[in-house]
Amino acid sequence: MPVPPAPPNFTPPPPPTGTPPGLGGASSPKVAELQAILRKANPAYQGQGKFHEENGEILAAELPNCNLSDLSPLKGLSLFGMDISGNPVREIRHLKGMPLRNLFMENTLVTDLSPLKGAPIVELRLNGTPLQSLKGLEGMPVENLYMLGTKVTDISALAGSKLRQLWLNETPVSNLAPLAGAP
């Protein structure tokens, strides 16, 4: 079966209030400080990440293919959207408690989703990860889930979900019964 075309590029979620967020650059002290902390924690990081701000608050982070392995500098941020795809990230405990709605972590080394438990994630992209379990996604409002090429076999964590799109090509999933009643 052919693999479907890649989904569209990361688009940060709409900000919760006011005007659209701006792209934080060197002129933003908060972004400059975060870039420096990311570089210190990840020596191979060259500062190519982009951050979206509104009213001085960082709301979204675009960090694909940035050689990040340590996400600790992001701990405590109230991010609504994040793309960490293509990074050698193994664990995501520092994302715990974030109000993430969109999270892209394709082609990472992440194997545990439990730190995401309770997050309001609507779109989650896990393509190409070594993930074997969806534990942690129970009861989440996920509508779009991309998990092509993962090692997940059991999708029971998605039972009762509001799932509208599920991409699971090249996975060993064989039982779709947990999705009965999904929209």
Model-flagged regions — what are they?
Residues 43-69, 76-111, 115-183:
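Concave beta-strand-loop units of leucine-rich repeat
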Residues 4, 12-65, 164:
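The feature captures the LRR N-terminal capping module
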